[in-house]
């Protein structure tokens, strides 16, 4: 345990230095975020902010590819992170759009297929200590839903300073506590990912000096999805990723009603933009979403332990 804490402490300052260099490098090259005209007008001032701070999450995972216990989550983090990185590069070139949504989902499907090949196959699905079902078909469906949904959901959540990073941090603290008893390489990787997130939030807190980019959102999504599979808490992920689910549902509802009734349910989706346009300050939206995320996670854990 002491080794994990010491390593994380040293790593925090290393990550701060890496991010500071990355910010300065992008500024010197004129690299920065392009803000789409369709977004809230208050976001126009963020134009030019350095991007792809989430590369640091890939740096964390690369060494852990060489350990049996951490190969699967590391591979998941890196593959989804590379998908996000490709999207970021396309956004830099095309300005107004990156990888098209359907193509992004298709690529997520291909990555998930590769991950399924490399994963251990325990077809049991639990809620707490209760076995819900043991079925290869249901497990495969759940596996694909988790890996396609979570990275894309975190990507949708990444729209305000500190929002995706902070909510992911809350979720990862659950997995750290859940795995701390084992005191193995996976525990160390989770601890270092949390450390990297804290270092990132040092610069991403409002007003952000750098954004995580799609590389960060997808890497975190791949990591969290893999942890839910490893720890057999796939169903609990609905509560562990509460805000991710809410943000995704808001987009689905908005698109569905617009196509059906030609009207919008929200002023703008994802949901965090709706509250911005309602007059909430960005920091208020972020902190209230943190609270909702934490409450949903605690509520889910209580329900999980009742069985």
Curated annotation (Swiss-Prot):
Q: What's its membrane topology? A: Multi-pass membrane protein
Q: Which gene encodes it?
A: mraY
State what this protein does.
Answer: Catalyzes the initial step of the lipid cycle reactions in the biosynthesis of the cell wall peptidoglycan: transfers peptidoglycan precursor phospho-MurNAc-pentapeptide from UDP-MurNAc-pentapeptide onto the lipid carrier undecaprenyl phosphate, yielding undecaprenyl-pyrophosphoryl-MurNAc-pentapeptide, known as lipid I.
Enzyme class, UniProt record, top EC level: transferase
Transit peptide as a keyword of this entry, yes or no, is no
**Family statement:** Belongs to the glycosyltransferase 4 family. MraY subfamily.
Give the matching InterPro entries.
Glycosyl_transferase_4, PNAcMuramoyl-5peptid_Trfase, PNAcMuramoyl-5peptid_Trfase_CS
The record ties this protein, via Pfam families, to: Glycos_transf_4 (PF00953)
In terms of NCBIfam families, this protein maps to: mraY
Kindly list the places in or outside the cell where this protein is found, as annotated in its UniProt entry: Cell inner membrane
GO terms of biological process kind = cell division; cell wall macromolecule biosynthetic process; cell wall organization; peptidoglycan biosynthetic process; regulation of cell shape
Highest taxon, organism lineage: Bacteria
UniProt-listed Enzyme Commission number(s): 2.7.8.13
Q: What is the lineage of its organism?
A: Bacteria, Pseudomonadati, Dictyoglomota, Dictyoglomia, Dictyoglomales
The pathway entry for this protein reads as:
Cell wall biogenesis; peptidoglycan biosynthesis
Q: What is this protein called?
A: Phospho-N-acetylmuramoyl-pentapeptide-transferase
Transmembrane spans: 3-23, 47-67, 71-91, 105-125, 137-157, 162-182, 186-206, 210-230, 237-257, 285-305
